[in-house]
């Protein structure tokens, strides 16, 4: 590796490094590469492909002559055209990191530390050495202190670190929902039109195949657009964010969520800037502390934590399968065929993924991931599905979220217990169950909720794996008291991979 290159050295920016904070100077020369093979290897959501290409091409248009923009089939074809040294911020996946370090012309490439996160890898490594259990809450509080966010001297603002207990209110019963203003929305332009035409042609020619439906672009693809989206969130939506952040409404897929994960994961927003902007909203009286703390926790806590866990546990982490779940994703799920589903929550949420490539974190965790965990689907396949089907999905995002959090495939390295529940949780936190053919209180019979029966089936299959987990003592004791367990298991096995 060459070291100490100047700001005149061309900066190679990947398609998730498109913001100004990935450059050392506003006028630094830039290399952008559009590689079609990235879309040939996997069946991505159509909206995800559009978003990535639109963002890359918009960045090239913004930079003009400052950028060398190469559109090739592979990255190597593009790099073969280079005759100058480049620098690059560390990529966000093991595969991309290995690739840039294996390019033959090593002396002409300088790999810089990663950007786009609030805590650097060296700092996390020091913290992890001192905190081997890797508890998120400890990491989050350390980040609050270190970054001086929501702190009054040495103490947290208003004397509280955590407003999770206040931010778990169920879905409102009012027909007006949350009564929150709409999120920011972009206007498409000629670049979007050309991206759509190119994707249509590639698919027509058989070069690529997509899942999901096309539609108007819904997320920011430039730093300017992303700042506009952030401004609308801080002004109109952040004040309402906290209390219902864990709730679901069938008629309101956005609720008060920011919808900033997609532009942030494209590198268009610096998460630390967003966190300080949210704190400013609290300090100026524009948003309550509970909502601001909940949002900042997602940025400097959860998002950074997921990033660091991905690297900390190594390349083999994505293949962990502690519960020995080997089931294949059924075709209806893999293809986002919500029409095959009758369970109201799963049907509606799968349709949202099909049509938009996005739902907020609770439908992801407590409906989609919960169902996959209960069915015993292979966690690597579930990870790949989330990566491909969500506009904000990337390798680093989904490996720890799925393997560690939602599928408990790491055996508890990250989460202390499996995140699974029966229909009662969905009934309490959403408005889905009232119009559903299934009853959340029933685990056997024609109207048995697939999540309720699935919950007990999951516990029965994995009782030995979970026997030494103290947090599972109560659920396993409940399992032993079930008189109709054999009937539950038989019914769930009959359902198998069929859509519920």
Regions found by a protein language model. Give the residues of each.
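Short, solvent-exposed loop/turn segments at secondary-structure junctions
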Residues: 17-19, 37-38, 93-94, 116-117, ...
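Short His-Asn-centered micro-motif
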Residues: 12-16, 33-34, 70-73, 88-91, ...
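A charged, amphipathic alpha-helical module
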Residues: 158-290
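N-terminal beta-strand-loop-alpha-helix module at the start
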Residues: 1-70
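C-terminal catalytic domain of photolyase/cryptochrome flavoproteins
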Residues: 3, 14-18, 247, 251-500
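Short helix/loop capping segments that flank catalytic or ligand/cofactor-binding pockets
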Residues: 21-22, 40-42, 96, 242, ...
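A generic secondary-structure signal
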Residues: 59-62, 81-82, 102, 277, ...
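Beta-rich, aromatic/charged-enriched effector core domains that present basic-aromatic interfaces
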Residues: 75-219, 403
């Amino acid at each position: 590796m060459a070291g100490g290159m100047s700001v005149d050295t061309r900066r190679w920016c990947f398609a998730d490094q498109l913001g100004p904070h990935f450059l050392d100077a506003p006028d630094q020369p830039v290399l952008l590469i559009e590689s079609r093979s990235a879309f040939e290897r996997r069946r991505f959501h159509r909206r995800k492909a559009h978003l990535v290409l639109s963002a890359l091409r918009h960045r090239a248009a913004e930079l003009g002559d400052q950028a060398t923009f190469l559109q090739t089939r592979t990255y190597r074809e593009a790099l073969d055209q280079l005759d100058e040294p480049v620098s690059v911020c560390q990529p966000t996946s093991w595969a991309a990191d290995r690739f840039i370090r294996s390019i033959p012309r090593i002396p002409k490439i300088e790999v810089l530390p990663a950007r786009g996160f609030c805590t650097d890898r060296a700092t996390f490594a020091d913290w992890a050495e001192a905190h081997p259990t890797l508890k998120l809450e400890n990491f989050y509080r350390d980040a609050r202190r270190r970054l001086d966010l929501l702190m009054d001297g040495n103490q947290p603002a208003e004397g509280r670190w955590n407003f999770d207990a206040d931010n778990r209110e169920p879905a409102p019963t009012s027909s007006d929902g949350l009564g929150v203003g709409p999120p920011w929305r972009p206007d498409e332009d000629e670049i979007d039109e050309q991206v759509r035409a190119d994707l249509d042609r590639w698919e027509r020619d058989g070069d690529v195949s997509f899942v999901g439906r096309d539609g108007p672009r819904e997320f920011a693809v430039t730093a300017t657009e992303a700042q506009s989206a952030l401004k609308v969130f801080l002004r109109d939506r952040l004040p309402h964010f906290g209390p219902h952040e864990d709730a679901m409404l069938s008629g309101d897929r956005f609720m008060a969520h920011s919808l900033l994960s997609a532009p942030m994961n494209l590198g268009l927003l610096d998460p630390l800037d967003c966190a300080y902007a949210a704190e400013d909203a609290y300090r100026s009286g524009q948003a309550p502390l509970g909502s601001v703390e909940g949002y900042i926790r997602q940025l400097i806590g959860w998002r950074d934590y997921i990033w660091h866990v991905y690297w900390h546990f190594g390349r083999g982490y994505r293949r962990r399968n502690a519960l020995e779940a080997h089931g294949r994703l059924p075709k209806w799920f893999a293809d986002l065929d919500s029409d095959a589903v009758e369970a109201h929550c799963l049907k509606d949420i799968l349709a949202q993924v099909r049509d938009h490539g996005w739902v907020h974190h609770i439908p992801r965790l407590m409906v989609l991931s919960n169902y996959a965990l209960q069915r015993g689907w292979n966690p690597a396949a579930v990870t790949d599905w989330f990566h491909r089907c969500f506009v904000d999905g990337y390798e680093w995002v989904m490996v720890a979220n799925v393997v560690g959090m939602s599928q408990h495939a790491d055996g508890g390295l990250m989460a202390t217990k499996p995140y699974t529940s029966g229909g009662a949780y969905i009934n309490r936190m959403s408005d889905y169950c009232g119009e559903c053919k299934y009853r959340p209180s029933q685990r056997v019979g024609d109207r048995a909720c697939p999540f309720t029966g699935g919950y007990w089936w999951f516990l029965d299959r994995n009782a030995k794996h979970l026997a030494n987990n103290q947090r599972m003592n109560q659920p396993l004791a409940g399992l032993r008291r079930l008189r109709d367990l054999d009937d539950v298991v038989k019914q769930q096995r009959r359902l198998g991979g069929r859509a519920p």
